[in-house]
Amino acid sequence: MATFISVPLKKTSEVDLVKPLSKYIHNTYPSGEDQTEYCRAVDELNKLRKSAVGRPLDKHETSLETVMRYYDQLCSVEPKFPFTESQLCLTFTWKDAFDKGSIFGGSVKLALPSLGYEKTCVLFNIGALASQIASEQNLDNDEALKAASKFYQLASGAFSHIKDTVLSSLNRDPTVDISPDTVGTLSLIMLAQAQEVFFLKATRDKMKDAVIAKLANQAADYYGDAFKQCQYKDTLSKEVFPILAAKHCIMQAHAEYHQSVLAKQQKKFGEEIGRLQHASDLVKTVSSRYDEYVNVKDLADKINRALTAAKKDNDFIYHDRVPDLKDLDPVGKASLVKSTPVNVPLSQKYTDLFEKMVPLAVQQCLSVYNQRKSELINSTIAQMRDATIFANGVLASLNLPAAVEDVSGDSIPQSILNKSKTVIEQGGIQTIGQLIRDLPELLQRNKEILEESLKFLDEEEATDNDLKAKFKDRWQRTPSTELYKPLRSEGSNFRNVLDKAIGADAVVKERYQSHREAIVILCKPEAELNAAIPSANPAKTMQGSEVVTVLKSLLNKLDDMKKEREQLENDIKSVNFDMTTKFLTALAQDGAVNEEAISVTELDQIYGSYTYKVQENLKKQEDLLNNIQSAHQEFSKMKQSNSEANLREEVLKNLAVGHDNYIELVANLKEGTKFYNDLTDILLKFQCKCSDIVFARKTERDELLKDIQQSIAREPSAPSIPQVPSYQSAPSSISTNIATSSIPTPAPRTVFSAKQPPPRPPPPAMPSASPVPASAAQASNPAPTAAADSSQPPSNTIPSQAQGPPYPSYPGYPGYYGMPMPVGYNPYMYGQQTIPPYMYQPPSGQPPYPAQQPSFSYPQQPFFPPQ
């Protein structure tokens, strides 16, 4: 009777995890020990998948342990990699576990780029393998009974978990085997079998009949519920339904039997007989309907023996009234089983291969934090650099410090010499010219990469739209138009960035042209530089004046402030703080990370003091520039004013401004070159991302096309089978066939008119024909139609050949016997005529052949009637 239901495993196609995961690791994590370790872990994960789902598995706990370790690893990997169609696209293909396939195509399968789908299918295999291991247990000992119950409850929990999560994991209709209805039924079946195992253990341990009856009745209840859930569905194999119905009756019979024993102990002999009669009826039902699936002979014998003895005792001794079945109290229920919840890790030997890799949520928080940090640092540094540029502009407009250095009127001020030296050391006009010439080439390279990336998306999207229009509702996958929205948005952002870069390049070129003449002068040797600066009358002796001393002091303080800002910039850039621990702690405590609150607080603590120092420095510079402008006004009043001095001062101002713009332009051009080079790397990654998703979509498209072709092949070519021709179904006379058949009537054969031969002697009787009296033979052959009718096969056999017009026969000569033809042979497909050959006629008066001697047989051709 111990017939248990086990679930077949799902089968999958091979998937290369190494290439896409390693590629993501190389693009995301810097080279070093962590990157090498993560790539090694990817190799181990790929091997683990092959061991868990890529080969046939033994029905043993070690195989189950391997599958559970793979499931645990999937749960660990899921939050650490962006498994989405638009980022890290891995397509997993699984076949329906219950579909046997057809002659027109393979079994039903589903391919989805979803790690949740992979987890669901692996969990299904955990439940299936657990059910197989439980079914293989030898239930003759306690350890095997405990193991079977444990594995059945594990299988029930796995199927129940799939029922609750499959729709949210897939976001589309799953295959039938993992649909909520199917796995819900499987979970209930596994629970019923676990309860039955407890019933068997209680019976083996000879527990009280009241307890055993409750356990059996609860098992019957589980089996009944499972049968109700699946009796109108064609999802499980056909053997499952009768087994569930039989188990329901059997466990109910056990419950009634043990309850009858309890009634006997309580001296309720009528109730005992009533329950035994009900148990006997249940067993008879199983024997009559489900005998090929379960054997209940021993149970039936035990119940019948008890029933016979109870009736005998009651008839002779007790005379207790036997109550009707409806009047019996229902048997109690006691459930000792429950679905084992799916709590990761399932495996006791699990070790996380990616233990050091932080979850994707933390990675995203770190990315946002680093962006906030960069924005804060860049804005602070930009403030300091803008302050320096502003101060240099003010000094250049006042011709400082050259004005206080140029007292002779014909020598080059030291500050101008220093500026000229700086320009020459940085490459002069050649460097800035080369940087400007390189920009268009770098820009064009980035534009080509971006256009090529978007072209990948456009071509695949056009193909997807064409197939959607062709197959309509059959084309069930995420439309490329919707899937590529994030990538197209990213591409649009890149295009805007390039447009802004083009505008910035134009501004840089315009500034270069405005100050090119001053920069060219600064690049000249000292003698040529001195000649390019107009001379003026010597200024009044002002070296010892108080205003010059004040100006020089103020200028020195301004230089100190510039140096202070440079030091602050270096200090701010050198600050480094790892937020991983804080984000991981928040994730562990709250289950989520409030990145903004944590990041703002930490950034304020780390950079608050630097921000304060920068603001103090800027405030001091503002006051200092005001003092410099006031002192310069007094200095200007003291200087001798003439046209030559004014012209010289104007040239010196232009040279100072040219120097400042040269430094700024070189910095901008180098920054622009770095920007384009960095953007090239980013665009190459974007191109790679587009290429990867297009390749994954093409693979998914090929799988879907294959599935659609197989589904089309499995569909019937017509709504119903046409009516079978009459000559293939019921053997009847030609006249009846022609009159009743609904198919077109074939044209009759051509019968050649020939001279009637003289009567021939009767041939010997055919071996297959039964002996017939001469009178009967004459009566049966009055006309050709009669002869034809006599050659018809019995009505309950398939005709030996296709029917055709009857051939003439002669008195005393039975119609010819046709050679058996293959069933379905159609004589109308061939143009030959079958006419009986002319047989030798003896001269008149010659005696006929003796009856015991056979006549001469002519040679026969294949497929022609024998003579």
UniProtKB/Swiss-Prot annotation:
Chief location category: cytoplasm
Biased composition (Low complexity): 729-744, 767-791, 852-861
CDD domains in UniProt: BRO1_Alix (cd09240), V_Alix (cd09235)
Domain BRO1: 3-391
Modification(s) after translation: Phosphorylated on tyrosine residues.
SMART domains: BRO1
UniProt KW Protein transport keyword: yes
InterPro entries in the cross-refs: ALIX_V_dom, BRO1_dom, BRO1_sf
Record's function text: Multifunctional protein that may be involved in endocytosis, multivesicular body biogenesis, membrane repair, cytokinesis, apoptosis and maintenance of tight junction integrity. Class E VPS protein involved in concentration and sorting of cargo proteins of the multivesicular body (MVB) for incorporation into intralumenal vesicles that are generated by invagination and scission from the limiting membrane of the endosome. Binds to the phospholipid lysobisphosphatidic acid (LBPA) which is abundant in MVBs internal membranes.
Protein name listed in UniProt: Programmed cell death 6-interacting protein
Organism of derivation: Xenopus laevis
Gene that specifies this protein: pdcd6ip
